[in-house]
Amino acid sequence: MSVELVPVRDVATRAAAERLIREYLEFIAEIALRNYQLTFDIEAMIASDLHDESKFFPPAGRFYVVRHAGEFVGVGCLKRLTPAVAEIQRMYVQPAVRGVGAGRLLVERLLADARAMQFKAIRLESLRVLSPAHALYRSVGFREIEPYNESSMTDYQSRDALTTYHSSAVFMELAL
C-alpha cells in the first residue's frame, strides 16, 4: 500500500495533525517523565503548533500528515530557526505502520523542502531513548552536535529543566 504526504491546510488535515501531535507528545511526555523527570505542557505545545501560522506553515515552514491505507498515521514539520537554519519537529509515525517507509519519505520531503527554501543546514532534537529514529536521521546524513540555543524546548522549559533536557536529548544537524 502506498504512503502519501498531505500538506496540513484544511479542517480534516488540521484535525489529523492535532490528533497525531497529541499522540506523539503524550508518548514523549511519558518517556520524559519516567526517564528524566521532565514534564511538558502538551496543550500549550499543540496550541502553538496549530495556531501559530508562522511556525510550521508556509512560507516559513512546512507541515505534513502521512496517509497510509486511507488513514492519517504520521506527522512531521519543518520550522525556520534562523534565515540559514531550519529544524525538523514533531516527526512521528504510529508504531503499527513503522517500517513501511513513511518516516523516510517524510524526512526526505522535509529535506527537499529545506533545500528548496534555501536553508544551509537543518537541525533536530530527539530524546536519547528514541534510537530507531536516530538511525533514520543518520542514514540521510545527520550528525550529532552540541545542544543549540534555538531549540524549541526553550519555549516550554525553565532554565534548570533545560539542562536536564539537554542531557536527555540528542541534537543533530545536516548541512544542506
Where are these regions (language model features)?
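C-terminal "cap" of GNAT-fold acetyltransferases
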Residues: 120-122, 127-176
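Extreme N-terminal starter segment of soluble prokaryotic enzymes
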Residues: 2-4
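Short polybasic/polar patches that bind polyanions
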Residues: 98, 115, 138
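Residues forming the Rossmann-fold NAD(P)(H) cofactor-binding site
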Residues: 100, 104, 108
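Conserved G/P- and acidic residue-centered "switch" motifs that form tight phosphate/ATP-binding loops
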Residues: 70, 101, 118
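Active-site acidic-Proline motif in GNAT/NAT acetyltransferases
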Residues: 94-100, 128-129
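Acetyl-CoA-dependent GNAT
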Residues: 7-89, 94-95, 107-109, 113, ...
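Loop/helix-junction capping segments adjacent to catalytic residues or to phosphate/diphosphate-binding pockets
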Residues: 11-15, 100, 131
